[in-house]
Amino acid sequence: MKLFLDTANIQEIKEAWSLGIIDGVTTNPTHISKENKKFRELIEEICSIVDGPISVEAVSLKAEEIVREAEELSKISPNIVVKIPAIKEGIKAAKILSEKGIKTNITLVFSPSQALLAGKVGATYVSPFVGRLNDISEEGINLVADIKKIYSNYGFKTQIIVSAIRNPMHVVKAALIGADVATMRFDILMSLFRHPMTDLGLEQFLKDWEKVPK
């Protein structure tokens, strides 16, 4: 399973990329707004760091405008993937962009039917938001399993990016289901390294090593 970092923060991206464990980056307008940098310059900087898919969101709501925006975004780098909301105009735009060879990521997906439509129009990625479903007392990871089954049934090539991840267990469950990608905040990515028993074991080993004659 591939791991993407869900941020637009350059320092976080540099650190995560240097570890050799991430394969791409996902951004959204909220991430971008926090960085206090010009939009295009920020995206270009991210592309200069990460040699992998970089999801950038189109903010238009009409299909024709989404297509125009996507065409401009795709000129920044061949690694750009255009995020498009799972609405009627977005699905319409994704079909056009797929035919033009522009990579797309259908985002804000909360139902199997939305994911089915993304697969039908040939979207490159689909992003089910598991954590937000959990926030309203639904089991978000079940949506991922449903999408995986639908795509398997019909041979859709659209890749599943498990999004809105709230904790490391979401990542593990996504991997067990067979999702293609999990995208997560920097702090959650860092938490994948940690287990208290690892810390205790390492502490004991180091103490014992000090007893070894040098």
UniProtKB/Swiss-Prot annotation:
Q: Cystine bridges: which residues?
A: none
Its GO biological process annotations read: carbohydrate metabolic process; pentose-phosphate shunt
**Per UniProt, what is the name of the gene that codes for the protein in this document?**
tal
GO cellular-component terms in the record? cytoplasm
Family per UniProt? Answer: Belongs to the transaldolase family. Type 3B subfamily.
What's the catalysed reaction? D-sedoheptulose 7-phosphate + D-glyceraldehyde 3-phosphate = D-erythrose 4-phosphate + beta-D-fructose 6-phosphate
Q: Report the active site residues.
A: 83
**InterPro entries from the UniProt entry:** Aldolase_TIM, TAL/FSA, Transaldolase_3B, Transaldolase_3B/F6P_aldolase, TSA/FSA_arc/bac
Subcellular location as annotated? Cytoplasm
Q: Name one GO molecular function term.
A: aldehyde-lyase activity
| Record-given protein name | Probable transaldolase
Q: What does this protein do?
A: Transaldolase is important for the balance of metabolites in the pentose-phosphate pathway.
- Pathways per UniProt: Carbohydrate degradation; pentose phosphate pathway; D-glyceraldehyde 3-phosphate and beta-D-fructose 6-phosphate from D-ribose 5-phosphate and D-xylulose 5-phosphate (non-oxidative stage): step 2/3
Q: What is its EC number?
A: 2.2.1.2
Q: Which UniProt keywords apply?
A: Cytoplasm, Pentose shunt, Schiff base, Transferase
